[in-house]
């Protein structure tokens, strides 16, 4: 419905603003899971990636490490075929059918926005999760004070 579309746009905008205001970040990361069996699976995969400190550190270091994305996906209970997952980073399909795809060197990791698309090829559900990278500034800001 029109109302649902309007509310979704507002909520998405608010989520982006929260991420952009996060202390010590250098990257804003969009993780979209498509063709999942259910929206629940798509959200679970996005959240697993968003919470993965190794992935967040790699993205801060501008390393398009799709293996860390697959590793995060592997921690979920989502329905998937582990041999048929595609990962696209900033428009470059670096992983196709869970194997190396296009060259990682083609991925522009310099921009503040990093867009990850995970294609499960198993259904029609999708979800987008927003997060940011893990930086030394973030660690410092959150460890340099007494509570």
Please report, for each region that a protein language model flagged, where it lies by residue:
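Unusually extended, aromatic-enriched hydrophobic runs near protein termini
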Residues: 1-6, 78-82
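Oxyanion-binding "anion nests"
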Residues: 2-41, 45
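Internal helix-turn-beta structural module
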Residues: 15, 35, 43-47, 51-147
């Amino acid at each position: 419905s029109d109302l649902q579309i309007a509310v979704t746009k507002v909520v998405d905008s608010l989520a982006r603003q929260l991420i952009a205001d996060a202390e010590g970040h250098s990257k804003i990361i969009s993780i979209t899971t498509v063709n999942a069996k259910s929206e629940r699976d798509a959200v679970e995969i996005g959240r697993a990636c968003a919470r993965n400190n190794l992935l967040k550190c790699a993205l801060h270091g501008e390393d398009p490490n799709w293996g860390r994305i697959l590793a995060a996906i592997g921690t979920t209970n989502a329905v998937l075929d582990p041999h048929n997952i595609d990962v696209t980073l900033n428009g470059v399909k670096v992983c196709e059918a869970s194997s190396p795809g296009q060259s990682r060197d083609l991925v522009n990791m310099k921009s503040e926005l990093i867009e990850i698309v995970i294609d499960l090829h198993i259904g029609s559900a999708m979800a987008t999760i927003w997060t940011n990278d893990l930086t030394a500034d973030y660690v410092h800001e959150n460890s340099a004070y007494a509570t």
